[in-house]
């Protein structure tokens, strides 16, 4: 359910684009992203950092898109957000006792420090590559292809990557259990 909630602005953007075009889709994504942050706050009394970062950039770049009537701004939004995530993940290797991925999952999974480090770096690299891939699609394909890639392409890539990470975690968590006996 959370996955659907996280993807709701993208789904609304996609549907609005298919019926009314890029500018209505941009405005719809701006409104739905603001609603997403508000609903999360009302329900949990806290903000989800991912939602807030996305909201900031969708409001900023969405406004530029609407004011200048140029879709390039909204097309750059995923790349900027992905690269911010990559920088934060990579930077977490140098600040604090544990990497960001370790801090997020340590209550649920027990892994060796080296495995946490590899997981964190793989997520940073994944987001870096997603940002580059988004720009490749932006500059080499039409807007319709980009919108389809933004929803379906990144969703499939994310699911495949998460599945790969799950297998990697399972292998190392199992090794940890065997070694502790």
Swiss-Prot record:
Plays a role in cell envelope biogenesis, maintenance of cell envelope integrity and membrane homeostasis. This is Inner membrane-spanning protein YciB. Pfam families: IspA (PF04279). The keyword Cell membrane applies. The keyword Transmembrane applies. The chain crosses the membrane at residues 8-28, 53-73, 76-96, 121-141, 149-169. It comes from the Bacteria.
């Amino acid at each position: 359910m959370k996955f659907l909630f996280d993807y709701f602005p993208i789904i609304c953007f996609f549907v609005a684009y298919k019926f009314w075009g890029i500018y209505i889709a941009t405005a719809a994504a701006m409104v739905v992203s603001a609603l997403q942050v508000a609903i999360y706050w009302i329900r949990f009394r806290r903000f989800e950092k991912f939602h807030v970062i996305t909201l900031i950039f969708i409001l900023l770049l969405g406004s530029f898109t609407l004011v200048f009537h140029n879709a390039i701004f909204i097309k750059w939004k995923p790349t900027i957000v992905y690269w911010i995530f990559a920088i934060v993940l990579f930077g977490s290797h140098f600040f604090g006792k544990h990497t960001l991925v370790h801090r997020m999952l340590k209550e649920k999974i027990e892994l060796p420090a080296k495995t946490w480090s590899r997981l964190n770096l793989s997520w940073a690299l994944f987001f870096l590559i997603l940002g580059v891939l988004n720009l490749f699609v932006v500059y080499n394909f039409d807007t319709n292809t980009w919108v389809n890639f933004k929803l379906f392409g990144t969703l499939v890539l994310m699911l495949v990557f998460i599945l790969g990470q799950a297998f990697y975690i399972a292998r190392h968590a199992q090794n940890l259990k065997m070694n502790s006996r």
